[in-house]
Design a protein with these regions (language model features):
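N-terminal glycine-rich anion-binding loops that anchor highly charged ligand groups
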Residues: 7-12, 36-38, 44-57
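Intrinsically disordered, low-complexity segments enriched in small/polar residues
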Residues: 4-5, 135
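Active-site-proximal beta-alpha core segment in soluble small-molecule metabolic enzymes
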Residues: 48-140
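Glycine-rich phosphate-binding segment of PLP-dependent enzymes
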Residues: 13-19, 35, 62, 66
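Generic N-terminal amphipathic, Lys/Arg-enriched alpha-helix
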Residues: 5-26
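An N-cap/entry alpha-helix motif that binds or orients negatively charged groups
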Residues: 19-41, 45
Length: 140
């Protein structure tokens, strides 16, 4: 991981892209931390919880930074729930439009919250969810 040049956020724009391997992700940690601080203040002022959506941003190399500010992770299945458990702190909320029966026990064990897509899903998986003391919800 390359460090920001001099720690000055203005230097990020001067980054020599030829120095970077390709492909790669380039993250301005200073800008990210500034945004996380805004979210943290919003949480304090409004008494809400904010979760990171791992489907959109699953960069586990900066999970410690993100976990200092956010309340947990929103996962879209078993593998994201495993990622959240291993690298991120806080609660794990898992949603899937179609949970697989052979994965649901493990998803329930990893997750604090399960969000279902239909009443049929609730009927199918309710007993397993309750066995692991998951809070449940339905997506509308």
């Amino acid at each position: 991981m390359l460090q920001t040049m001099g720690g000055n956020p203005k230097n990020f724009n001067k980054l020599d892209l030829k120095r970077l391997p390709s492909p790669c992700f380039v993250i301005d940690k200073i800008a990210l931390q500034n945004n996380l601080e805004i979210l943290f203040e919003l949480k304090k002022e409004t008494n809400i919880k904010i979760l990171i959506a791992l489907k959109a941003f699953s960069t586990f190399s900066i999970a410690n930074l993100i976990s200092k500010y956010l309340d947990g992770s929103c996962c879209s299945g078993l593998y994201e729930a495993k990622l959240a458990k291993k690298y991120f702190k806080g609660e794990i909320s898992t949603y899937s439009p179609a949970f697989k029966k052979d994965e649901f026990d493990e998803i329930s064990k990893l997750s604090d919250h399960i969000i279902f897509n239909s009443f049929n899903q609730i009927n199918t998986f309710y007993d397993v969810s309750k066995k692991f003391n998951n809070e449940i919800g339905i997506r509308i």
